[in-house]
């Protein structure tokens, strides 16, 4: 079926209806909070947001008890992984009264281009890709830039390693060698047959991790393999496009038996970088770092300028051609105002 193209007026009407519905839901929540705070609430205690449902969240207390909570109107936007102060209610529903400072946050632009946090207090971003759908270095590099920009340690994870065969082995090996050469940690696993899953468990224990990657690469299947008994609605590849169908709808936090947490967030096909500048993109390519600032011209675009340190490193073999091509492709996709 062809994609429906909306007129500007139709898009405006849809957006207005959604805003009105959100406003009504917010008013209902405010009334609920007022009623709770007018009654008996327990003492303040700390907890962690383990799931977000729009106007309500699930909070886990220090003793492992999970409660549904309303949000005070003056709170900033909360995301899964946030540490909060909350008060329990006598009807089983509590109230979030404060957000504690974040150690880190992972953000990406929403459909309007506005920066939106998607997970908090993460210290490892696991970039999942697979032989099918076909992996692209450009998308992996976008995730790496986001991780470097946020100061979060990346881990590259090739899932569905059992699908590597004669038809794709050469391309997969070449892709993996690029990132191994750069020094990024990389694990090849299969949630299907259990290949190297113990190695992955060891890499995740003791960390707060988030899985990112295209739909169809098996993020939900990995969660099911790592945490038996947890159902995260696994979807199949689209037979028409070969891309994954979106399955996981709500970011959730899970605990590993040996310590550490996993935040499983919705799959995305394209990861925008509208919130980073050209300088941020350059810094996200770790092999560029020692070269930046050493070009002949301060405003060097690293294209054809004489005395460019990056072009010289490319010629000398210190920068791989495919990485330079990916860098240029990412810059070309950014708004010109960010140059």
From Swiss-Prot:
Chain residues that bind GTP: 159-162, 213-221
Key words of the record: Cytoplasm, GTP-binding, Hydrolase, Metal-binding, Nucleotide-binding, Ribosome biogenesis, RNA-binding, rRNA-binding, Zinc
Transmembrane segments: none
Cofactor entry: Zn(2+)
Positions of disulphide bridges: none
E.C. numbers: 3.6.1.-
Annotated CP-type G domain residues: 111-271
Subcellular location: Cytoplasm
GO terms of biological process kind: ribosomal small subunit biogenesis
Record's keyword annotation contains GTP-binding: yes
Cofactor note: Binds 1 zinc ion per subunit.
Assembly mode: Monomer. Associates with 30S ribosomal subunit, binds 16S rRNA.
NCBIfam families: PRK12288.1, ribosome small subunit-dependent GTPase A
The family this protein is said to belong to: Belongs to the TRAFAC class YlqF/YawG GTPase family. RsgA subfamily.
PANTHER family: SMALL RIBOSOMAL SUBUNIT BIOGENESIS GTPASE RSGA (PTHR32120), SMALL RIBOSOMAL SUBUNIT BIOGENESIS GTPASE RSGA 1, MITOCHONDRIAL-RELATED (PTHR32120:SF11)
Protein name, per record: Small ribosomal subunit biogenesis GTPase RsgA
Gene: rsgA
């Amino acid at each position: 079926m062809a994609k429906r193209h909306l007129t500007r007026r139709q898009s405006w009407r849809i957006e207005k209806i959604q805003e009105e519905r959100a406003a009504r839901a917010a008013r209902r929540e405010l009334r609920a909070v007022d009623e709770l705070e007018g009654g008996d609430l327990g003492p303040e205690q700390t907890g962690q947001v383990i799931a977000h449902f729009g106007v309500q969240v699930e909070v886990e207390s220090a003793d492992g008890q999970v409660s549904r909570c309303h949000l005070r109107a003056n709170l900033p936007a909360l995301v899964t992984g946030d540490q909060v102060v909350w008060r329990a209610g006598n009807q089983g529903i509590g109230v979030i009264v404060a957000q504690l400072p974040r150690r880190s946050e992972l953000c990406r632009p929403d459909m309007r281009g506005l920066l939106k946090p998607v997970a908090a207090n993460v210290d490892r971003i696991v970039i999942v890709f697979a032989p099918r759908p076909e992996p692209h270095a450009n998308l992996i590099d976008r995730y790496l830039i986001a991780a470097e920009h946020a100061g979060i340690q990346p881990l590259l994870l090739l899932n569905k390693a059992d699908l590597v065969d004669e038809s794709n082995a050469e391309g997969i090996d070449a892709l993996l060698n690029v990132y191994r050469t750069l020094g990024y940690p990389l694990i090849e696993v299969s949630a299907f047959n259990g290949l190297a899953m113990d190695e992955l468990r060891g890499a995740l224990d003791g960390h707060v991790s988030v899985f990112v990657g295209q739909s169809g690469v098996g993020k939900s299947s990995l969660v099911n393999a790592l945490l038996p008994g947890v159902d995260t609605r696994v979807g199949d590849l689209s037979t028409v496009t070969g891309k994954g169908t979106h399955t996981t709808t709500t970011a959730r936090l899970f605990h590993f038996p040996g310590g550490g947490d996993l935040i499983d967030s919705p799959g995305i096909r394209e990861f925008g970088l509208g919130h980073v500048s050209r300088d941020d993109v350059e810094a996200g390519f770790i092999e560029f770092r020692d070269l930046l600032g050493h070009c002949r011209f301060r405003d060097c675009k690293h294209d054809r300028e004489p005395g460019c340190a990056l072009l010289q490193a490319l010629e000398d073999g210190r920068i791989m051609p495919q990485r330079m091509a990916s860098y240029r492709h990412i810059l070309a996709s950014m708004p010109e105002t960010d140059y």
